[in-house]
Amino acid sequence: MQLKSSISLKQQTLFRQHCLIDGEWQDSQNGERLDVTNPATGAVLGSVPLVTVSQTEQAIAAAELALVEWRKKTGKERAALLQAWARLIMDNQEDLAALLTAEQGKPLAEARGEIAYATSFIDWFAEEAKRIEGSVLQSPQGQQRLLVIKQPIGVCAAITPWNFPAAMITRKVGPALAAGCTMIVKPAEQTPFTALALAELAQQAGIPRGVLQVIVGDAQSVGKVLCDSPVVRKLSFTGSTEVGRILMAQSAPTVKKLSLELGGNAPFIVFDDADVDQAVKGILASKFRNSGQTCVCANRIYVQNGIYPTLVERLVEEVRKLNVGDGTQPGVTQGPLIDADAVSKVEQHIADALSHGATLLLGGKRHELGGTFFTPTIVGGVTREMRFAREETFGPVAPLFRFSDEAEAVAMANDTEFGLAAYVYTRDAVRQWTVPEALDYGMVGINTGLISNEVAPFGGVKQSGLGREGSRFGIEDYLEMKYLCVDLSR
């Protein structure tokens, strides 16, 4: 089937409009396809097949078959293949960034950065593949020798989001393949082309058929097949807490191992003794990166009373400079929101706050470019009764709360069911320790608005998820521990 392409790439084979199942590029068995649009222009970029239940089961069977040989490879052999994949990704960084911006909307500079960030996980876990270690235990019985070995958990599945369509895949696939597992990836329907391009490069790198597969389809039906299958031993999901709960329930009958990176409602606390310019810089990086569409975005900005007027003035000044537009254009710093539902949610949160007494300090409306573009917005006088305090906005809106002292700031920040990321700005050396330790969050940035990297463990507490990704701990979620007891009695 010949499919038209609206994206021009140096390596045109990276623009794949079929799913990768058992080493073959397949169309849907029932012919159903889904158009993928550019959120900046509304233009149709291409289409992808919606796989059937039967095709999902075929992918699971292929992953199970591929596991037999893949797990036998040494860590060094798996590392070499992962490193080859990483090199190809960076060799094709411009093409991948173009694909990513076209389907997701973020500025090209951010897209290039994401491709490099995505590659860092593959590089990191390629090295970790060679460092999977066991233990020798001191036995209480003299004639026995006790050992602990680690083995791949088996067939894994990943369900990934649209906001980081490259990095959220490699952060899961990297450790899975390094550990000796096989992986089925189900990317978001809004952004499948980046995932398919990564799979094409994995094939070029020599990763065997069935080891990495990418399927696109209805999230509910595909997700349920993956959860129901006893062959799939591990599921990794990045997305909303609501969907995470559903996947947990569906995985319970087969007692799967789960990694869940779920909703965030990140507090960003600025104390009176903070460096105002650094705090504003941190807010811009944390809140407005990717147009506010990240799980670790500053969703509630708490500013101490003494510094509040100065920070508001500086923040308004800097946010005015943000340039909204098509991410392919030079100088653009804010792309569109992903779809009309995202715009509607932003508008609802702003309207709710204003109806409860908040003040609009900047923006607050759709951008003159139309479509899903939204003006960067600042809302002051926000209180805990407003939706900003309870829900992720996932848009370019900075809601400002006031607080009087440290105890109040910590109490307000912890007043949520979520616990992914938090941020603290202060020059006080003691407070730099006491406040982060008191915050119920899995990650805390202190005098920085950017905390993500491949070296540190990424994940949350409470209803923000289970497990950690990245870091030396990330590979552990793809390994099973086995205890061996050897009796030497004659």
Map each language-model feature to its residues.
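Rossmann-like NAD(P) dinucleotide-binding subdomain of oxidoreductase/dehydrogenase enzymes
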Residues: 134-278, 403
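Short, well-ordered beta-strand elements within core beta-sheets of diverse protein domains
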Residues: 45-51, 66-72, 158, 268-271, ...
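ALDH superfamily catalytic-core signature
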Residues: 242-383, 446
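Residue-level signal for inorganic ion chemistry
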Residues: 42, 78, 100, 122, ...
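Glycine-rich loop-to-alpha-helix module at the N-terminal edge of alpha/beta enzyme cores
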Residues: 43-132, 143
